[in-house]
Regions:
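Adenine nucleotide phosphate-binding catalytic loops in nucleotide-utilizing enzymes
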Residues: 146-147
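ATP-dependent adenylation/nucleotidyltransferase module used to activate substrates
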Residues: 1-132, 142, 151-153
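His/Asp/Glu-rich metal-coordinating catalytic cores
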Residues: 134-137
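Anionic-ligand-binding alpha/beta catalytic cores of soluble enzymes and soluble regulatory domains
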Residues: 154-168
Length: 168
């Protein structure tokens, strides 16, 4: 076991308040679900407001690239600058040695190097949006879902009594 904290990155305003969660992601309901899961697991839970950084480093870049005829993938920049940039820095300030995310990918240490590997479940693999991770980031990241299929993830969550076991 590890000593864990839970967190959500607030990346934009709450314009989705009152909208069905089927039509949005990262809604206020999702934040409350995450808080409930953290509480059930006995972990402290935080919401980190990175909305200004997200707009400047992900959204504005995406819009500019799109306007110049490119087809950008904002997930790559979000992972690079937000999860493994801002969140990793905040985690270090809080005394965390690692961050763990729900990405379906794996990390292997071999011959003195960390290798980013595809998830066991090829239909859920997300390693392609993590290609920009540095050796330091890989050394301090855990992908606990990478060795599981989605059905197994749901089963474990259900057995743990987590309210989000059936969430899409």
């Amino acid at each position: 076991g590890n000593e864990c904290i839970g967190c959500t990155m607030k990346l934009y305003g709450n314009e989705d308040a009152g909208i069905s969660r089927a039509h949005t992601c990262c809604s206020l309901d999702d934040v409350e679900d995450a808080r409930s899961v953290a509480h059930r697991l006995g972990m402290p839970y935080y919401v980190f407001n990175f909305s200004d950084d997200f707009r400047a480093t992900v959204i504005d870049k995406f819009v500019d690239s799109y306007l110049h005829g490119m087809t950008p993938n904002p997930c790559i920049d979000c992972n690079r600058y937000m999860k493994f940039g801002k969140l990793y820095e905040r985690a270090k300030i809080l005394g965390c040695d690692h961050i763990a995310t729900g990405h379906y990918a794996r990390i292997e240490y071999r011959d003195g190097k960390y290798l980013l590997k595809k998830a066991v479940d090829p239909s859920k693999d997300q390693s392609y949006v993590l290609y920009a991770m540095t050796q330091d980031e890989l050394a301090h990241t855990l992908f606990p879902l990478g060795g599981m299929c989605k059905t197994e993830t749901r089963r474990v969550a259900d057995e743990g009594g987590l309210i989000n076991a059936d969430k899409p």
